[in-house]
Regions:
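Short Gly/Pro-enriched turn/cap motifs at secondary-structure boundaries
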Residues: 22, 115-116, 136-138
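Short catalytic-loop micro-motif centered on adjacent basic/acidic residues
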Residues: 37-40, 61-64, 133-136
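Conserved beta-strand hairpin/beta-sheet module of binuclear metal-dependent hydrolase folds
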Residues: 2-54, 146-154
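Active-site HxH/HxHxD metal-binding segment of metal-dependent hydrolases
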Residues: 48-126
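Short, glycine/acidic-enriched loop or turn micro-motifs at the edges of active sites
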Residues: 43-44, 69, 92, 139, ...
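Metallo-beta-lactamase
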Residues: 131-138, 142-154
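Short, well-ordered coil/turn elements that cap or connect secondary structure elements
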Residues: 9, 33-34, 81, 127-129
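Short Pro/Gly-enriched beta-strand edge/turn motifs at strand-loop
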Residues: 10-18, 104-107, 128-132
Length: 154
């Protein structure tokens, strides 16, 4: 079973994707789209639905919050499909380039992320209407990053 929902928060589109190999999904993941920026790419087990939902977006860049499969599972596919760079923290770049092992339950629930060339973000990530400042927030993972919107331009 799967979940696909779309919500809008002002200028931000939030897409919820959940996958359950048996029955209702136990958890879901959000992919955010704001003004040419995709934040996170969801789990690879939901690739068909994610690519379908985001096919008409025209991203300029993809940002990853961290390397976990449920957030990075379609980084390669979306980057390749839209011909855009994938950006993240230096640790995210290192992990996403390596042939890393994942636990069997992770592969079963989320699928495996493909290796992808993640470029390290700069001090700011700018789009036409947003200025995002990456802030390293280790805890959930050593590479976890949040993106603070510091200058919205209507």
């Amino acid at each position: 079973m799967h979940i696909v929902n779309h919500r809008q928060f002002g200028e931000i589109d939030a897409y919820e994707f959940g996958y359950g190999p048996v029955g209702r999904p136990l958890m879901s993941v959000y992919v955010y789209v704001l003004d040419g920026v995709i934040v996170d790419t969801g789990q690879s087990n939901m690739r068909k639905y994610i690519l379908e939902q985001l096919r008409d977006t025209q991203p300029e860049v993809i940002l990853l919050t961290h390397h976990h499969e449920d957030h990075s599972g379609n980084a390669f596919a979306l980057g390749d499909c839209h011909r855009v760079d994938v950006l993240g923290h230096p640790l995210t770049a290192q992990k996403m380039a390596a042939k890393r092992k994942i636990l069997p339950y992770q592969r079963y629930i989320w699928g495996k992320s493909e290796d992808v060339n993640v470029k390290v973000f700069g001090t700011l990530v700018e789009s036409a209407h947003f200025t995002l400042m990456p802030i390293h927030t280790p805890g959930h993972s050593k590479d976890h990053t949040v993106y603070l919107e510091i200058e919205f331009r209507a």
